[in-house]
Protein backbone atom coordinates (compact mmCIF):
# COMPACT_ATOMS: atom_id res chain seq x y z
CA UNK A 1 0.00 0.00 0.00
CA UNK A 2 1.40 3.36 -1.05
CA UNK A 3 0.60 6.71 0.53
CA UNK A 4 1.33 9.97 -1.17
CA UNK A 5 2.84 12.86 0.83
CA UNK A 6 -0.42 14.85 0.98
CA UNK A 7 -2.28 11.92 2.61
CA UNK A 8 0.49 11.52 5.16
CA UNK A 9 0.37 15.22 6.08
CA UNK A 10 -3.47 15.07 6.40
CA UNK A 11 -3.21 12.02 8.65
CA UNK A 12 -0.63 13.70 10.90
CA UNK A 13 -2.73 16.90 11.00
CA UNK A 14 -5.88 14.99 12.10
CA UNK A 15 -3.92 13.11 14.76
CA UNK A 16 -2.54 16.38 16.14
CA UNK A 17 -6.02 17.96 16.21
CA UNK A 18 -7.43 14.95 18.08
CA UNK A 19 -4.67 15.03 20.67
CA UNK A 20 -5.63 16.68 23.96
CA UNK A 21 -2.71 17.77 26.08
CA UNK A 22 -3.42 19.19 29.53
CA UNK A 23 -0.74 20.24 31.91
CA UNK A 24 -1.22 19.52 35.60
CA UNK A 25 0.86 21.55 38.01
CA UNK A 26 0.85 20.07 41.47
CA UNK A 27 3.49 20.29 44.15
CA UNK A 28 4.63 16.84 45.15
CA UNK A 29 7.02 15.45 47.69
CA UNK A 30 8.22 12.15 49.09
CA UNK A 31 7.58 10.36 52.37
CA UNK A 32 10.65 10.58 54.61
CA UNK A 33 9.28 8.76 57.68
CA UNK A 34 6.04 7.06 58.70
CA UNK A 35 5.19 6.24 62.33
CA UNK A 36 1.93 5.97 64.33
CA UNK A 37 -0.17 7.54 61.58
CA UNK A 38 2.15 10.57 61.37
CA UNK A 39 4.02 11.17 58.11
CA UNK A 40 7.01 13.42 57.47
CA UNK A 41 7.03 14.61 53.86
CA UNK A 42 9.94 16.35 52.10
CA UNK A 43 9.52 18.65 49.10
CA UNK A 44 6.03 20.13 49.58
CA UNK A 45 7.12 23.77 49.31
CA UNK A 46 3.68 25.28 48.56
CA UNK A 47 1.58 23.29 51.03
CA UNK A 48 -0.86 25.16 53.32
CA UNK A 49 -1.79 24.53 56.95
CA UNK A 50 -4.77 22.14 57.10
CA UNK A 51 -4.51 21.26 53.40
CA UNK A 52 -5.59 17.82 52.21
CA UNK A 53 -2.71 15.70 50.89
CA UNK A 54 -3.08 12.79 48.47
CA UNK A 55 -1.13 9.59 49.16
CA UNK A 56 -0.88 6.50 46.93
CA UNK A 57 -3.81 4.06 47.03
CA UNK A 58 -6.50 6.75 47.41
CA UNK A 59 -5.47 7.62 50.97
CA UNK A 60 -5.67 11.21 52.21
CA UNK A 61 -4.05 13.14 55.01
CA UNK A 62 -3.96 16.59 56.60
CA UNK A 63 -0.89 18.84 56.68
CA UNK A 64 -0.62 20.08 60.28
CA UNK A 65 3.04 20.97 60.89
CA UNK A 66 4.80 23.21 58.37
CA UNK A 67 8.52 23.06 59.15
CA UNK A 68 11.59 24.44 57.37
CA UNK A 69 12.54 21.30 55.44
CA UNK A 70 9.58 18.94 55.92
CA UNK A 71 5.85 18.80 56.52
CA UNK A 72 4.24 16.85 59.37
CA UNK A 73 0.94 15.32 58.25
CA UNK A 74 -1.62 13.03 59.83
CA UNK A 75 -3.14 10.18 57.77
CA UNK A 76 -6.91 9.71 57.66
CA UNK A 77 -7.66 6.01 57.65
CA UNK A 78 -5.44 2.97 57.02
CA UNK A 79 -1.78 3.55 56.16
CA UNK A 80 -0.27 0.02 56.15
CA UNK A 81 0.23 0.16 52.35
CA UNK A 82 2.36 3.34 52.51
CA UNK A 83 6.16 3.28 52.65
CA UNK A 84 9.14 5.64 52.69
CA UNK A 85 9.85 7.13 49.27
CA UNK A 86 6.18 7.15 48.15
CA UNK A 87 4.99 10.23 46.26
CA UNK A 88 2.69 12.69 48.09
CA UNK A 89 0.72 15.34 46.17
CA UNK A 90 -0.86 18.62 47.29
CA UNK A 91 -4.56 19.00 46.45
CA UNK A 92 -4.98 22.76 47.19
CA UNK A 93 -8.22 21.81 48.98
CA UNK A 94 -9.46 21.73 52.56
CA UNK A 95 -10.97 18.41 53.67
CA UNK A 96 -14.66 18.25 52.65
CA UNK A 97 -17.52 15.98 53.68
CA UNK A 98 -20.84 15.23 51.94
CA UNK A 99 -23.92 17.17 53.12
CA UNK A 100 -27.64 17.07 52.42
CA UNK A 101 -30.94 15.31 53.11
CA UNK A 102 -29.57 12.00 51.75
CA UNK A 103 -27.50 11.58 54.94
CA UNK A 104 -30.61 11.36 57.17
CA UNK A 105 -31.09 7.89 58.61
CA UNK A 106 -27.50 6.90 57.80
CA UNK A 107 -24.43 5.99 59.84
CA UNK A 108 -21.23 7.49 58.41
CA UNK A 109 -17.57 7.75 59.41
CA UNK A 110 -15.68 11.00 60.03
CA UNK A 111 -15.15 11.45 56.26
CA UNK A 112 -18.88 11.08 55.54
CA UNK A 113 -18.48 7.61 54.00
CA UNK A 114 -21.36 5.19 54.80
CA UNK A 115 -20.53 2.37 57.25
CA UNK A 116 -24.05 0.97 57.75
CA UNK A 117 -24.07 -1.35 54.71
CA UNK A 118 -27.02 0.46 53.11
CA UNK A 119 -25.17 1.43 49.93
CA UNK A 120 -23.68 4.71 48.69
CA UNK A 121 -25.07 8.14 49.64
CA UNK A 122 -26.28 10.44 46.86
CA UNK A 123 -25.22 13.63 48.64
CA UNK A 124 -26.24 17.06 47.35
CA UNK A 125 -22.66 18.29 47.51
CA UNK A 126 -19.65 18.60 49.77
CA UNK A 127 -18.63 21.30 52.25
CA UNK A 128 -15.33 21.97 54.06
CA UNK A 129 -15.14 20.66 57.62
CA UNK A 130 -13.53 23.88 58.87
CA UNK A 131 -15.71 26.97 58.55
CA UNK A 132 -15.72 30.37 60.19
CA UNK A 133 -18.61 30.79 62.64
CA UNK A 134 -21.34 33.36 61.79
CA UNK A 135 -20.44 36.89 62.93
CA UNK A 136 -22.37 38.90 65.51
CA UNK A 137 -24.43 40.81 62.90
CA UNK A 138 -25.74 37.54 61.42
CA UNK A 139 -26.92 36.13 64.74
CA UNK A 140 -30.33 36.27 66.37
CA UNK A 141 -31.01 35.95 70.09
CA UNK A 142 -32.17 32.57 71.37
CA UNK A 143 -35.94 32.66 71.95
CA UNK A 144 -37.33 29.27 70.89
CA UNK A 145 -37.08 26.15 73.07
CA UNK A 146 -35.58 22.75 72.39
CA UNK A 147 -37.81 20.49 74.49
CA UNK A 148 -35.75 17.60 75.86
CA UNK A 149 -38.83 15.92 77.36
CA UNK A 150 -37.03 15.67 80.72
CA UNK A 151 -38.80 17.43 83.61
CA UNK A 152 -35.63 18.38 85.46
CA UNK A 153 -34.00 19.98 82.39
CA UNK A 154 -37.00 21.70 80.80
CA UNK A 155 -38.13 23.20 84.12
CA UNK A 156 -34.77 24.15 85.67
CA UNK A 157 -32.07 24.34 82.95
CA UNK A 158 -34.01 24.95 79.71
CA UNK A 159 -32.23 24.72 76.36
CA UNK A 160 -33.00 27.12 73.49
CA UNK A 161 -32.52 26.71 69.74
CA UNK A 162 -29.02 27.92 68.88
CA UNK A 163 -27.67 27.44 72.41
CA UNK A 164 -24.61 25.43 73.50
CA UNK A 165 -25.50 23.51 76.67
CA UNK A 166 -22.76 21.34 78.15
CA UNK A 167 -23.60 17.95 79.69
CA UNK A 168 -20.83 17.15 82.18
CA UNK A 169 -20.25 14.34 84.65
CA UNK A 170 -18.21 11.27 85.55
CA UNK A 171 -18.43 8.08 83.54
CA UNK A 172 -21.63 6.07 84.03
CA UNK A 173 -23.77 8.99 85.21
CA UNK A 174 -26.24 8.98 82.30
CA UNK A 175 -24.76 11.71 80.05
CA UNK A 176 -25.46 9.86 76.79
CA UNK A 177 -28.94 8.90 78.06
CA UNK A 178 -29.86 12.59 78.50
CA UNK A 179 -28.62 13.44 74.99
CA UNK A 180 -30.38 10.45 73.35
CA UNK A 181 -33.64 11.36 75.14
CA UNK A 182 -33.30 14.89 73.73
CA UNK A 183 -32.91 13.44 70.20
CA UNK A 184 -35.90 11.08 70.64
CA UNK A 185 -38.06 13.98 71.89
CA UNK A 186 -37.50 15.93 68.63
CA UNK A 187 -39.87 13.55 66.80
CA UNK A 188 -42.48 15.68 65.06
CA UNK A 189 -40.69 18.91 66.09
CA UNK A 190 -39.05 19.50 62.67
CA UNK A 191 -35.55 19.43 64.17
CA UNK A 192 -32.76 17.55 62.37
CA UNK A 193 -30.43 15.71 64.78
CA UNK A 194 -26.77 14.76 64.40
CA UNK A 195 -25.18 12.37 66.89
CA UNK A 196 -21.36 12.36 66.80
CA UNK A 197 -19.81 9.39 68.64
CA UNK A 198 -16.11 9.97 69.42
CA UNK A 199 -13.86 7.26 70.85
CA UNK A 200 -16.70 5.04 72.03
CA UNK A 201 -17.00 1.25 71.90
CA UNK A 202 -18.57 0.06 68.64
CA UNK A 203 -21.06 -2.03 70.66
CA UNK A 204 -22.28 1.07 72.58
CA UNK A 205 -22.77 2.98 69.32
CA UNK A 206 -24.64 0.02 67.80
CA UNK A 207 -27.01 0.01 70.81
CA UNK A 208 -27.70 3.75 70.38
CA UNK A 209 -28.41 3.33 66.64
CA UNK A 210 -30.68 0.35 67.35
CA UNK A 211 -32.66 2.35 69.92
CA UNK A 212 -33.02 5.35 67.57
CA UNK A 213 -34.30 3.01 64.84
CA UNK A 214 -36.76 1.34 67.27
CA UNK A 215 -38.42 4.63 68.21
CA UNK A 216 -38.36 6.01 64.65
CA UNK A 217 -35.79 8.72 65.42
CA UNK A 218 -33.30 7.69 62.71
CA UNK A 219 -35.63 9.24 60.09
CA UNK A 220 -34.40 12.71 61.13
CA UNK A 221 -30.96 11.76 62.52
CA UNK A 222 -27.43 11.43 61.11
CA UNK A 223 -24.94 9.35 63.13
CA UNK A 224 -21.25 10.21 62.66
CA UNK A 225 -18.91 7.58 64.10
CA UNK A 226 -15.22 7.68 65.01
CA UNK A 227 -15.08 4.69 67.36
CA UNK A 228 -12.31 3.76 69.80
CA UNK A 229 -10.81 1.41 67.19
CA UNK A 230 -10.27 4.24 64.69
CA UNK A 231 -7.19 6.44 64.44
CA UNK A 232 -6.71 9.57 66.54
CA UNK A 233 -6.96 11.65 63.35
CA UNK A 234 -10.49 10.37 62.63
CA UNK A 235 -11.55 11.04 66.24
CA UNK A 236 -10.11 14.55 65.96
CA UNK A 237 -12.01 15.51 62.77
CA UNK A 238 -15.34 13.74 63.53
CA UNK A 239 -16.95 16.68 65.45
CA UNK A 240 -16.06 19.13 62.65
CA UNK A 241 -17.55 16.77 60.05
CA UNK A 242 -20.78 16.44 62.04
CA UNK A 243 -20.93 20.22 62.54
CA UNK A 244 -20.64 20.83 58.78
CA UNK A 245 -23.52 18.39 58.17
CA UNK A 246 -25.61 20.29 60.74
CA UNK A 247 -24.70 23.71 59.32
CA UNK A 248 -26.15 22.69 55.95
CA UNK A 249 -29.63 22.56 57.58
CA UNK A 250 -29.02 25.69 59.70
CA UNK A 251 -28.07 27.70 56.60
CA UNK A 252 -31.26 26.56 54.83
CA UNK A 253 -33.42 28.08 57.56
CA UNK A 254 -34.06 24.83 59.44
CA UNK A 255 -33.35 23.86 63.04
CA UNK A 256 -30.72 21.26 63.90
CA UNK A 257 -29.45 19.68 67.12
CA UNK A 258 -25.96 18.19 67.39
CA UNK A 259 -24.63 16.00 70.19
CA UNK A 260 -20.85 15.58 70.60
CA UNK A 261 -20.31 12.40 72.64
CA UNK A 262 -17.78 13.22 73.92
CA UNK A 263 -15.32 16.09 73.49
CA UNK A 264 -12.96 14.77 76.18
CA UNK A 265 -11.99 11.92 73.86
CA UNK A 266 -11.54 14.38 70.98
CA UNK A 267 -9.14 16.40 73.17
CA UNK A 268 -7.25 13.19 74.01
CA UNK A 269 -6.98 12.34 70.30
CA UNK A 270 -5.72 15.85 69.50
CA UNK A 271 -3.19 15.64 72.36
CA UNK A 272 -1.94 12.34 70.95
CA UNK A 273 -1.55 13.81 67.44
CA UNK A 274 0.19 16.94 68.78
CA UNK A 275 2.68 14.97 70.88
CA UNK A 276 3.49 12.67 67.94
CA UNK A 277 4.05 15.79 65.81
CA UNK A 278 6.51 16.95 68.52
CA UNK A 279 4.55 20.08 69.38
CA UNK A 280 5.49 21.50 72.79
CA UNK A 281 3.15 20.20 75.53
CA UNK A 282 1.47 22.51 78.03
CA UNK A 283 -0.84 21.91 81.01
CA UNK A 284 -1.78 18.21 81.40
CA UNK A 285 0.39 17.60 78.26
CA UNK A 286 -2.26 19.23 76.04
CA UNK A 287 -0.97 21.49 73.24
CA UNK A 288 -1.32 25.27 73.53
CA UNK A 289 -4.29 25.49 71.15
CA UNK A 290 -6.61 22.98 72.85
CA UNK A 291 -8.97 25.83 73.84
CA UNK A 292 -9.20 26.88 70.19
CA UNK A 293 -9.86 23.23 69.27
CA UNK A 294 -13.22 23.41 71.07
CA UNK A 295 -14.05 27.12 70.75
CA UNK A 296 -13.93 27.13 66.94
CA UNK A 297 -16.20 24.07 66.93
CA UNK A 298 -18.79 25.27 69.45
CA UNK A 299 -18.98 28.84 68.11
CA UNK A 300 -20.44 27.37 64.91
CA UNK A 301 -23.59 26.42 66.85
CA UNK A 302 -25.78 29.53 66.61
CA UNK A 303 -29.18 30.95 65.83
CA UNK A 304 -28.82 32.88 62.56
CA UNK A 305 -31.16 35.60 61.27
CA UNK A 306 -33.21 35.67 58.06
CA UNK A 307 -30.62 37.82 56.23
CA UNK A 308 -27.94 35.19 56.83
CA UNK A 309 -30.20 32.38 55.55
CA UNK A 310 -31.13 34.44 52.47
CA UNK A 311 -27.43 35.12 51.77
CA UNK A 312 -26.42 31.47 52.35
CA UNK A 313 -29.15 30.12 50.03
CA UNK A 314 -28.57 32.73 47.33
CA UNK A 315 -32.02 34.27 47.87
CA UNK A 316 -33.92 30.95 47.59
CA UNK A 317 -35.09 30.98 51.24
CA UNK A 318 -36.45 34.26 52.60
CA UNK A 319 -37.87 35.27 55.98
CA UNK A 320 -36.68 32.13 57.83
CA UNK A 321 -34.16 31.90 60.65
CA UNK A 322 -31.98 28.84 61.17
CA UNK A 323 -30.34 27.33 64.22
CA UNK A 324 -27.78 24.74 65.24
CA UNK A 325 -28.05 23.75 68.91
CA UNK A 326 -25.06 21.94 70.44
CA UNK A 327 -25.07 19.51 73.36
CA UNK A 328 -21.37 18.80 73.95
CA UNK A 329 -20.58 16.08 76.50
CA UNK A 330 -17.52 16.17 78.76
CA UNK A 331 -16.40 13.32 81.00
CA UNK A 332 -14.82 14.30 84.32
CA UNK A 333 -12.48 12.22 86.49
CA UNK A 334 -13.77 11.77 90.06
CA UNK A 335 -16.04 14.81 89.71
CA UNK A 336 -13.14 17.21 89.07
CA UNK A 337 -14.65 20.03 87.00
CA UNK A 338 -11.55 22.19 87.54
CA UNK A 339 -9.44 20.10 85.15
CA UNK A 340 -8.17 21.76 81.96
CA UNK A 341 -10.68 20.57 79.33
CA UNK A 342 -13.83 20.81 81.54
CA UNK A 343 -13.03 24.43 82.54
CA UNK A 344 -12.34 25.32 78.90
CA UNK A 345 -15.65 23.95 77.65
CA UNK A 346 -17.61 25.40 80.61
CA UNK A 347 -16.27 28.85 79.67
CA UNK A 348 -17.19 28.40 75.98
CA UNK A 349 -20.74 27.10 76.42
CA UNK A 350 -23.95 28.91 77.44
CA UNK A 351 -24.56 26.80 80.53
CA UNK A 352 -24.01 23.30 81.85
CA UNK A 353 -25.94 20.33 83.19
CA UNK A 354 -23.95 18.64 85.98
CA UNK A 355 -24.62 14.94 86.49
CA UNK A 356 -23.37 13.46 89.77
CA UNK A 357 -22.38 9.88 90.61
CA UNK A 358 -23.81 10.13 94.15
CA UNK A 359 -27.24 11.16 92.88
CA UNK A 360 -27.14 8.51 90.15
CA UNK A 361 -26.28 5.78 92.67
CA UNK A 362 -29.03 7.05 95.00
CA UNK A 363 -31.54 6.34 92.22
CA UNK A 364 -32.15 9.98 91.27
CA UNK A 365 -32.07 9.75 87.48
CA UNK A 366 -31.41 11.90 85.51
CA UNK A 367 -28.76 12.64 88.18
CA UNK A 368 -28.86 16.42 87.75
CA UNK A 369 -27.40 18.61 90.47
CA UNK A 370 -29.87 21.52 90.32
CA UNK A 371 -27.67 23.77 92.44
CA UNK A 372 -24.72 24.03 90.06
CA UNK A 373 -26.48 23.31 86.76
CA UNK A 374 -27.33 26.50 84.89
CA UNK A 375 -28.67 27.68 81.55
CA UNK A 376 -27.38 31.16 80.71
CA UNK A 377 -29.66 31.93 77.75
CA UNK A 378 -32.32 29.20 77.80
CA UNK A 379 -34.63 31.10 80.18
CA UNK A 380 -35.64 33.43 77.35
CA UNK A 381 -36.58 30.41 75.24
CA UNK A 382 -38.57 28.51 77.88
CA UNK A 383 -42.24 27.81 77.12
CA UNK A 384 -44.51 30.18 79.07
CA UNK A 385 -46.36 27.48 80.99
CA UNK A 386 -43.16 25.73 82.16
CA UNK A 387 -41.53 29.07 83.04
CA UNK A 388 -44.57 29.99 85.14
CA UNK A 389 -44.69 26.65 86.97
CA UNK A 390 -41.00 25.68 87.03
CA UNK A 391 -39.71 28.63 89.04
CA UNK A 392 -41.17 27.22 92.24
CA UNK A 393 -39.45 23.86 91.72
CA UNK A 394 -35.97 25.32 91.55
CA UNK A 395 -36.68 27.40 94.67
CA UNK A 396 -38.10 24.38 96.53
CA UNK A 397 -35.01 22.31 95.71
CA UNK A 398 -32.60 25.13 96.63
CA UNK A 399 -34.32 25.67 100.00
CA UNK A 400 -34.50 21.92 100.58
CA UNK A 401 -30.74 21.47 100.12
CA UNK A 402 -30.04 24.39 102.45
CA UNK A 403 -32.43 23.19 105.15
CA UNK A 404 -31.49 19.51 104.80
CA UNK A 405 -27.92 20.34 105.88
CA UNK A 406 -29.18 22.06 109.09
CA UNK A 407 -31.93 19.52 109.73
CA UNK A 408 -29.32 16.82 110.35
CA UNK A 409 -28.23 18.64 113.53
CA UNK A 410 -31.59 20.02 114.71
CA UNK A 411 -33.68 17.75 116.93
CA UNK A 412 -37.02 19.55 116.67
CA UNK A 413 -38.17 21.47 113.58
CA UNK A 414 -41.00 24.00 113.37
CA UNK A 415 -43.96 23.27 111.09
CA UNK A 416 -42.90 25.65 108.27
CA UNK A 417 -39.40 24.14 108.06
CA UNK A 418 -40.79 20.60 108.12
CA UNK A 419 -43.18 21.48 105.27
CA UNK A 420 -40.36 22.94 103.20
CA UNK A 421 -38.29 19.80 103.71
CA UNK A 422 -41.23 17.59 102.70
CA UNK A 423 -41.91 19.73 99.61
CA UNK A 424 -38.21 19.52 98.64
CA UNK A 425 -38.14 15.75 99.09
CA UNK A 426 -41.25 15.44 96.93
CA UNK A 427 -39.80 17.73 94.24
CA UNK A 428 -36.63 15.59 94.15
CA UNK A 429 -38.75 12.44 93.82
CA UNK A 430 -40.88 13.89 91.02
CA UNK A 431 -37.85 14.97 89.01
CA UNK A 432 -37.01 11.28 88.54
CA UNK A 433 -37.73 9.95 85.07
CA UNK A 434 -37.08 6.68 83.26
CA UNK A 435 -34.85 6.58 80.19
CA UNK A 436 -36.67 6.91 76.83
CA UNK A 437 -39.85 8.07 78.67
CA UNK A 438 -39.89 11.68 77.45
CA UNK A 439 -42.88 13.88 78.28
CA UNK A 440 -44.98 16.40 76.36
CA UNK A 441 -45.16 19.99 77.63
CA UNK A 442 -48.74 19.49 78.86
CA UNK A 443 -47.82 16.37 80.89
CA UNK A 444 -44.87 18.19 82.43
CA UNK A 445 -47.08 21.18 83.24
CA UNK A 446 -49.61 18.90 84.97
CA UNK A 447 -46.98 17.47 87.36
CA UNK A 448 -45.46 20.88 88.13
CA UNK A 449 -48.90 22.44 88.67
CA UNK A 450 -49.99 19.69 91.07
CA UNK A 451 -46.72 19.98 93.00
CA UNK A 452 -46.90 23.79 93.28
CA UNK A 453 -50.53 23.69 94.44
CA UNK A 454 -49.69 21.17 97.17
CA UNK A 455 -51.65 18.22 95.79
CA UNK A 456 -48.69 15.94 96.46
CA UNK A 457 -48.30 17.06 100.10
CA UNK A 458 -50.42 14.28 101.58
CA UNK A 459 -49.11 11.58 99.22
CA UNK A 460 -46.62 9.04 100.59
CA UNK A 461 -43.25 9.78 98.94
CA UNK A 462 -42.86 6.11 97.96
CA UNK A 463 -46.15 6.32 96.03
CA UNK A 464 -45.43 9.73 94.45
CA UNK A 465 -44.48 8.45 90.97
CA UNK A 466 -47.43 6.02 90.96
CA UNK A 467 -49.74 8.91 91.93
CA UNK A 468 -48.26 11.06 89.16
CA UNK A 469 -48.74 8.30 86.56
CA UNK A 470 -52.34 7.61 87.64
CA UNK A 471 -53.13 11.35 87.66
CA UNK A 472 -51.84 11.71 84.09
CA UNK A 473 -53.89 8.73 82.91
CA UNK A 474 -57.04 10.09 84.59
CA UNK A 475 -56.68 13.61 83.14
CA UNK A 476 -55.82 12.24 79.68
CA UNK A 477 -58.87 9.93 79.71
CA UNK A 478 -61.48 12.22 81.29
CA UNK A 479 -60.20 15.75 80.66
CA UNK A 480 -58.04 15.38 77.54
CA UNK A 481 -59.22 18.75 76.21
CA UNK A 482 -57.38 20.57 79.03
CA UNK A 483 -54.07 18.91 78.12
CA UNK A 484 -54.67 19.53 74.40
CA UNK A 485 -55.28 23.23 75.09
CA UNK A 486 -52.04 23.55 77.12
CA UNK A 487 -50.10 21.61 74.44
CA UNK A 488 -51.39 23.87 71.66
CA UNK A 489 -51.04 27.26 73.39
CA UNK A 490 -48.04 26.41 75.66
CA UNK A 491 -49.74 28.72 78.18
CA UNK A 492 -51.84 28.36 81.32
CA UNK A 493 -54.61 30.95 81.58
CA UNK A 494 -56.93 31.45 84.58
CA UNK A 495 -59.76 29.44 83.00
CA UNK A 496 -57.54 26.43 82.21
CA UNK A 497 -56.01 26.66 85.68
CA UNK A 498 -59.46 26.41 87.30
CA UNK A 499 -60.44 23.47 85.10
CA UNK A 500 -57.16 21.69 85.85
CA UNK A 501 -57.53 22.26 89.58
CA UNK A 502 -61.07 20.85 89.53
CA UNK A 503 -59.90 17.81 87.54
CA UNK A 504 -57.07 17.08 90.02
CA UNK A 505 -59.46 17.44 92.99
CA UNK A 506 -61.87 15.03 91.31
CA UNK A 507 -59.04 12.51 90.88
CA UNK A 508 -57.94 12.90 94.52
CA UNK A 509 -61.47 12.11 95.70
CA UNK A 510 -62.19 9.17 93.40
CA UNK A 511 -58.88 8.03 91.88
CA UNK A 512 -56.87 4.98 92.83
CA UNK A 513 -53.11 4.69 92.62
UniProtKB/Swiss-Prot annotation:
Topology versus the membrane: Peripheral membrane protein
Enzyme Commission number(s): 7.1.2.2
Superkingdom classification of source: Bacteria
GO molecular function: ADP binding; ATP binding; proton-transporting ATP synthase activity, rotational mechanism
Membrane-spanning ranges: none
InterPro entries with a match to the protein in the record: ATP_synth_asu-like_sf (IPR023366), ATP_synth_asu_C (IPR000793), ATP_synth_asu_C_sf (IPR038376), ATP_synth_F1_a_nt-bd_dom (IPR033732), ATP_synth_F1_asu (IPR005294), ATPase_a/bsu_AS (IPR020003), ATPase_F1/V1/A1_a/bsu_N (IPR004100), ATPase_F1/V1/A1_a/bsu_N_sf (IPR036121)
Assigned keywords, A-Z: ATP synthesis, ATP-binding, Cell inner membrane, Cell membrane, CF(1), Hydrogen ion transport, Ion transport, Membrane, Nucleotide-binding, Translocase, Transport
HAMAP family reported in the protein's UniProt record: ATP_synth_alpha_bact
Protein function: Produces ATP from ADP in the presence of a proton gradient across the membrane. The alpha chain is a regulatory subunit.
PANTHER family associated with the record: ATP SYNTHASE SUBUNIT ALPHA, MITOCHONDRIAL
Complex and partners: F-type ATPases have 2 components, CF(1) - the catalytic core - and CF(0) - the membrane proton channel. CF(1) has five subunits: alpha(3), beta(3), gamma(1), delta(1), epsilon(1). CF(0) has three main subunits: a(1), b(2) and c(9-12). The alpha and beta chains form an alternating ring which encloses part of the gamma chain. CF(1) is attached to CF(0) by a central stalk formed by the gamma and epsilon chains, while a peripheral stalk is formed by the delta and b chains.
Descriptive protein name: ATP synthase subunit alpha
Organism: Nitrosomonas europaea (strain ATCC 19718 / CIP 103999 / KCTC 2705 / NBRC 14298)
Amino acid sequence: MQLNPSEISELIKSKIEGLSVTSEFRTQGTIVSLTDGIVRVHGLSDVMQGEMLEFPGGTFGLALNLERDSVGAVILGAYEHLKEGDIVKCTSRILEVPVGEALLGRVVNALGQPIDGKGPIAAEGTEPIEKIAPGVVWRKSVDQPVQTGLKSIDSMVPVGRGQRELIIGDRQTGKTAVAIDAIINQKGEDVICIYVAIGQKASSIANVVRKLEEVGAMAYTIVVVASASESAAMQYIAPYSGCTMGEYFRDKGQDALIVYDDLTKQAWAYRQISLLLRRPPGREAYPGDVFYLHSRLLERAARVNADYVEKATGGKVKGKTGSLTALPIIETQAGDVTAFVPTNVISITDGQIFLESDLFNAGIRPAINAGISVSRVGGAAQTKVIKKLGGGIRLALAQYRELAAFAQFASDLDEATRKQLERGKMATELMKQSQYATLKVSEMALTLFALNKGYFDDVDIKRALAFESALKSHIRSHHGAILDKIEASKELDAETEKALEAAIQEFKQNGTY
